[in-house]
Design a protein with these regions (language model features):
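A short glycine-rich, His/Asp/Glu-containing loop-to-beta-strand
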Residues: 1-17
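Conserved hydrophobic/aromatic beta-strand scaffold that supports enzyme active sites
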Residues: 9-11, 30, 48, 56-58, ...
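Short histidine-centered beta-strand/loop micro-motifs
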Residues: 10-12, 20-25, 42, 48-49, ...
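Short acidic (Asp/Glu) patches
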Residues: 14-17, 35, 60-65
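Glycine- and acidic-residue-biased ligand/ion/polar-headgroup-sensing regions
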Residues: 16, 25-44
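Short Gly/Pro-enriched loop/turn and capping motifs at secondary-structure junctions
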Residues: 38-39, 64-66, 83-86
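Short acidic-glycine-tyrosine-enriched beta hairpin
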Residues: 43-64
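Double-stranded beta-helix
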Residues: 69-118
Length: 118
């Protein structure tokens, strides 16, 4: 967590053949696939992209919602989340693409503090 630059680096692990909740990236981000395949799905569940281990991608905010998950094995991905401000990083969406919740730099910073205190 970099308070000055408003950057959060975090490892995510997605289970094999599972999809996380529908969401939209609303801030810049970079990803690096450490293990497995990072799979990107359309809101309807169709496979759009497969990123194998070793894949680096710089991403921009995107109005297109999607789901993500692992391939034949669990996937571990380094996400470098770069909102550069206190605006939302993610919007969590329902099936109608309505915003259920958001995640901000402050939310991730608080989660990090709680983890360090445990």
């Amino acid at each position: 967590v970099d308070d000055t630059a408003k950057i959060v680096d975090v490892l995510f692990k997605f289970s094999a053949h599972e999809k996380i909740i529908l969401h939209r990236h609303t801030a810049n981000f970079n990803t690096f696939v450490i293990q497995g395949e990072h799979r990107i799905y359309s809101p309807e569940g169709d496979l759009k992209e497969i990123r194998p281990a070793g894949t680096y991608k710089a991403g921009l905010p995107d109005i297109e919602p999607h789901k993500e998950g692992g391939g034949d094995e669990d996937v571990i991905i380094l996400f470098s989340l770069r909102p550069y401000n206190d605006d939302p990083i993610y919007e969590i969406l329902d099936d109608d693409h309505s915003v259920l919740d958001t995640m901000t730099f402050g939310d991730l910073k608080e989660m990090y503090k709680e983890q360090q205190a445990a």
